[in-house]
Amino acid sequence: MHKYQTHWVESSEIKILSDKGKKHIALVAGGMSAEREVSLISAEGVGKALIEAGYKVTFIDMGADITVKLHEIKPDIVFNCLHGTYGEDGCLPGLLNIMRIPYTHSGVLASSLAFDKVHSRSWFLTNNINMAESIVISKGDNIKTDPIKRPYVIKPFTQGSSIGVEVIFEEDDFNFANYDFPYGDEVIIEKYIKGRELQVAILNGKALGALEIKLLKNRFYDYETKYTEGFAEHLCPAPLPTDIYDKLLKESEKIYNTMNCKGAARVEFILEDGTNKLYALEINTHPGMTPLSIVPEIAAYHGIDFVNLIEEILKTASFES
């Protein structure tokens, strides 16, 4: 398994993308998480869309001095294009609340809750959202054998883009005693549900639609599959019976609204083979905006082009008092 590294960045890099416009948008991306590369790809498209829509845009590759840089440029709005730690986990929203700068996407509670797979699972179950059975394993437990019956999924507590996720099948040459806990001292071990991978895009509390992921190469929807062209096929809209499709959208809206999310989000489900039972996997409060990303694709199918999507997200910008 490839390990995606985090790295500390002292100084934020600033680049003026457009010096004229109706409002000044600080596009914050990059940063110090393992999802840095995806964030930068998302920001490239978002930056072009903001310029096309007529905004003054300053790109900030976030470092430890982000507060100083924001104070210097004094933006009207921050477009939070960070993925992973420091941005998607509620850190940047918390800072912007203190600075009283409006920002896109969810606030501190929704962001931090969604990013932590253990606490978000508790939230889902409390709100009667169906999920696969799971347990938490700590490095100190010194587990030497499979913690549950195969097949099962290993998930880090706090990573996105399927970073660190592994699926252990019956035939795999895998010894849990050798697992090195690359993304923290605790992991979730989840029962593997064989079924159809479904994704729902939500904008401002309403589900836009759903698509199905058909794997073409890898065994599950991992980081490589998500961001490499030709590794998966997207079926939009998801070819489902009407009752299941409607339930999928309704459950997604329930998750989004009970968590008090804001702007755009993406919710992942598995539709189990044989039973047609829906299992929620997670909600992503900072969905990707890359050329292969799901939310822009679903939005486009429903008549919202990329520039309009970015403007709709921008309209929701606010800070929490």
UniProtKB/Swiss-Prot annotation:
Which positions carry the signal peptide feature in this UniProt record?
none
From the UniProt record, give one GO term of the biological process aspect.
regulation of cell shape
Which EC number(s) does the record attach to this protein? 6.3.2.4
Domain ATP-grasp stretches = 121-315
Q: Which cofactor does it need?
A: Mg(2+); Mn(2+)
What's this protein's family per the entry? Belongs to the D-alanine--D-alanine ligase family.
Involved pathway(s): Cell wall biogenesis; peptidoglycan biosynthesis
Q: Which organism is it from?
A: Rickettsia bellii (strain RML369-C)
What InterPro entries does its record include? ATP-grasp, ATP_grasp_subdomain_1, D-Ala_lig_Van_CS, D_ala_D_ala, Dala_Dala_lig_C, Dala_Dala_lig_N, PreATP-grasp_dom_sf
Per UniProt, where does ATP bind? 148-199
Amino-acid positions noted as binding Mg(2+) 1 in the UniProt annotation, renumbered to this chain:
268, 282
Catalytic activity field: 2 D-alanine + ATP = D-alanyl-D-alanine + ADP + phosphate + H(+)
| GO molecular-function terms, A-Z | ATP binding; D-alanine-D-alanine ligase activity; metal ion binding
**Binding-site positions, Mg(2+) 2:** 282, 284
SUPFAM superfamilies named in the record: Glutathione synthetase ATP-binding domain-like, PreATP-grasp domain
Entry's cofactor comment: Binds 2 magnesium or manganese ions per subunit.
Protein name (database record): D-alanine--D-alanine ligase
Q: Name the keywords, alphabetized.
A: ATP-binding, Cell shape, Cell wall biogenesis/degradation, Cytoplasm, Ligase, Magnesium, Manganese, Metal-binding, Nucleotide-binding, Peptidoglycan synthesis
